[in-house]
Amino acid sequence: MPLVAHTRLPTFERLKQEGQTVLSEDYAFQQDIRELHIGFLNMMPDAALAATERQFLRLVNESNLIAQFHIHPFTLGTLPRGDKAQAHIAQYYDKFEDLQEQGLDALIITGANPAAPHLEDEPFWDGLCEVVAWAQENVTSTLCSCLASHALVQHLWGIRRRPLGFKRWGVYSHAVTMPEHPLVNDLNTRFDVPHSRFNQIDREPLEAVGVQVLVESTEAGVHMAVSPDLFRMVFMQGHPEYDTVSLLKEYRREVTRWFDGTRADYPPFPQNYLRPKAKAILNEYRLEQEKAKRLGKPLPDFPEKLLLPMLHNTWCDTAKVFYSNWIGKVYQLTNNDRRKPFMEGVNPDDPLGLRQQLGI
């Protein structure tokens, strides 16, 4: 299901340069195929805005090569933005009010950079709740990433996330816990997912309100769960959209914070991510940093080019299969009129018919 470059969003050109299939609008118009319209609520901070576009759009684009995708990025006006990001948004992003009028088949909601002790005090809170209230009535399925999952589980069911007291950071092994669900069809029974968070929502409070857990890790906890109707909302605590280098970039950011004094302790390595040789290189880099800091010298160059060939990606293939499953089900269930969430005869409280099948 290739993306259609229906706007001049620079991410389309970046993906084409990577070898991704991105159709021109003229070419797509010649194909007699009902395109799928997917909203993309990007709440990430300015520095990660474009990278987050690429990560999620890449997964959507690789999910299938038959249908067409029109991606509609939008954001919330309450999020603080610099001039450059604001100009990017003004030029390339849709307005939520327009999307409400035009309709969407599916919606992806990114995480965000936490700025307040409590989620309800975050600048995105009211706007996010408004978007989801509309989506629950008008969108076939909504996929929520990390902090968005935490916020919406709290908003919808009053479940507050649990502080871990440390950062769950690295790549962890997971297992499918509900193999009969079509969203995990053809996924490996065990696979890896990156995590990067200080908080967690556990299985027990989710199950108490009817949320079903699909994927879980003995070490990292719940990764994927679905709303009680089993499809209309999909929650993720992990980051299957991450690039191979994403955790390394986070590590680089943290060691820079230590060097400039905004972090007290030197950061640990992300778990299960770096090979021994990569750790040895980074330990040498730490010694260089410590010496430079003692002598009042500039931050030494980070050895990213040396490290890149040593990084493995053990999660991307599974992420592609999941996105294929999710988008395929949206395509099967959505109405031909994208202002309506389902085709005639689909039960909104059990769109997959799975609750009835399983006797839930």
UniProtKB/Swiss-Prot annotation:
Protein species of origin: Thiothrix nivea (strain ATCC 35100 / DSM 5205 / JP2)
Keyword Lyase among UniProt keywords: no
Q: Name one GO biological process term.
A: methionine biosynthetic process
Q: Which residues form the active site?
A: 146 (acyl-thioester intermediate), 239 (proton acceptor), 241
Residue sites binding substrate per the record: 167, 196, 253
Instruction: Write out the function statement from the record.
Output: Transfers a succinyl group from succinyl-CoA to L-homoserine, forming succinyl-L-homoserine. In vitro, can also use glutaryl-CoA as acyl donor.
Which pathway does the record list?
Amino-acid biosynthesis; L-methionine biosynthesis via de novo pathway; O-succinyl-L-homoserine from L-homoserine: step 1/1
E.C. designation(s): 2.3.1.46
Q: What is the name of this protein?
A: Homoserine O-succinyltransferase
The site annotation (Important for acyl-CoA specificity) covers 113, 115, 147
Localization terms from the record: Cytoplasm
Q: Where is this site: Important for substrate specificity?
A: 196
* Reactions it catalyzes: L-homoserine + succinyl-CoA = O-succinyl-L-homoserine + CoA
Matching InterPro entries: Class_I_gatase-like, MetA_family
Which SUPFAM superfamilies would you find in this protein's record?
Answer: Class I glutamine amidotransferase-like
GO MF annotations, alphabetized: homoserine O-acetyltransferase activity; homoserine O-succinyltransferase activity
Q: What class of enzyme is it?
A: transferase
List GO terms (cellular component aspect). cytoplasm
Determine the domain of life of the protein's source: Bacteria
Gene it is expressed from: metAS
Quote the CDD domains the UniProt record gives: GATase1_HTS
What are the record keywords, sorted? Acyltransferase, Amino-acid biosynthesis, Cytoplasm, Methionine biosynthesis, Transferase
Q: Where the protein is mainly located, per its record?
A: cytoplasm
